[in-house]
Amino acid sequence: MPELPEVETTRRGIDTVITGRTLRRLVVREARMRWPIPPALPDLLAGRTVLECGRRGKYLLLRFDHGVQIVHLGMSGSLRRVPEQEAPRKHDHVDWVFDHAVLRLHDPRRFGAVLWHPDEAGPIAAHPLLARLGIEPFDPRFDGRWLHAYFRGRRVAIKQALLAGDAVVGVGNIYASESLFRAGIDPRTAAQRVSAARCDRLAAAIRATLSDALDSGGSTLRDYVGASGEPGAYFAIHAAVYERAGLPCRVCGTPIRRLVQGQRATYFCPSCQKR
């Protein structure tokens, strides 16, 4: 699934292309996404100008003068710029057609979303998909104290607490494993047992891991590509534990272990990461 670095990489790639530009038409080839695309949406957006291209967690937010379009890439989606004459491929479900560019949503599993939040429905932050999201990892308020306060009384494993997204957004499966390795914390540790000092290390590790991923254009394991069609390089360059089960730890040489938590694969070094 595209995580925060992949979505932010996509946002940066399309921001300068579409912000301040008028959408000529929205082409919907397949409306049956995670939630059906509203049939009236193409008419609502035709001839309207994109005022801002934002992001909240893993959601892209395209601001128009009468509302916000919410775009989620799902499990395997990508949003890229294509030549207007390029014929759509299988799983190319939605096009945003501008005078100078076309953005195309490719989503083989159709777990993504293209939704509309009109201004009269209230602030976009109150939308049900966004209202319960945690703090952004690059928000100045996010630090070890924030995590320590959130983890108080939570018996769930620290890895699963991070994946929940209500403490801090955007730390998905890959980057949770990588951040916990950097912080030296065993992913099975109960969240409430992580000390204030270790929460400080974890907050710093999350920021550093996501910064590395952003600098590398995100991670590509299977389907993800950036707005220009380029794969992310984080996994090939930086991954210390993810999908390295049985291989030696890059720090101590101990074989990396794999386990399943909440139906998600977790990778860790049993020597470097302590409970």
Swiss-Prot record:
Instruction: Give one GO biological process term.
Output: base-excision repair
Instruction: Name the chemical reaction catalysed here.
Output: Hydrolysis of DNA containing ring-opened 7-methylguanine residues, releasing 2,6-diamino-4-hydroxy-5-(N-methyl)formamidopyrimidine; 2'-deoxyribonucleotide-(2'-deoxyribose 5'-phosphate)-2'-deoxyribonucleotide-DNA = a 3'-end 2'-deoxyribonucleotide-(2,3-dehydro-2,3-deoxyribose 5'-phosphate)-DNA + a 5'-end 5'-phospho-2'-deoxyribonucleoside-DNA + H(+)
EC number(s) stated in the UniProt entry for this protein: 3.2.2.23, 4.2.99.18
Provide the protein name.
Answer: Formamidopyrimidine-DNA glycosylase
Q: How does it assemble?
A: Monomer.
Which family is this sequence assigned to? Belongs to the FPG family.
- Keyword vocabulary terms for this entry: DNA damage, DNA repair, DNA-binding, Glycosidase, Hydrolase, Lyase, Metal-binding, Multifunctional enzyme, Zinc, Zinc-finger
Where along the chain is the active site annotated? 2 (schiff-base intermediate with dna), 3 (proton donor), 58 (proton donor), 264 (proton donor)
- One of the record's GO molecular function terms: 8-oxo-7,8-dihydroguanine DNA N-glycosylase activity
Residue spans annotated as Zn fingers (FPG-type) read: 240-274
Cofactor binding comment, as recorded: Binds 1 zinc ion per subunit.
Q: Which domain of life is it from?
A: Bacteria
User: Which cofactors is this protein said to need?
Assistant: Zn(2+)
- Write down the PANTHER family for this protein, in alphabetical order: FORMAMIDOPYRIMIDINE-DNA GLYCOSYLASE
What gene codes for this chain?
mutM
InterPro entries from the xrefs? DNA_glyclase/AP_lyase_DNA-bd, DNA_glyclase_Znf_dom_DNA_BS, Formamido-pyr_DNA_Glyclase, FPG_cat, MutM-like_N-ter, Ribosomal_uS13-like_H2TH, Znf_DNA_glyclase/AP_lyase, Znf_FPG/IleRS
Function per UniProt: Involved in base excision repair of DNA damaged by oxidation or by mutagenic agents. Acts as a DNA glycosylase that recognizes and removes damaged bases. Has a preference for oxidized purines, such as 7,8-dihydro-8-oxoguanine (8-oxoG). Has AP (apurinic/apyrimidinic) lyase activity and introduces nicks in the DNA strand. Cleaves the DNA backbone by beta-delta elimination to generate a single-strand break at the site of the removed base with both 3'- and 5'-phosphates.
Answer whether the UniProt record assigns the keyword Plastid to this protein: no
- The UniProt record gives the binding positions of DNA as 91, 109, 154
- Native organism: Bordetella pertussis (strain Tohama I / ATCC BAA-589 / NCTC 13251)
Tell me which CDD domains the record gives.
EcFpg-like_N
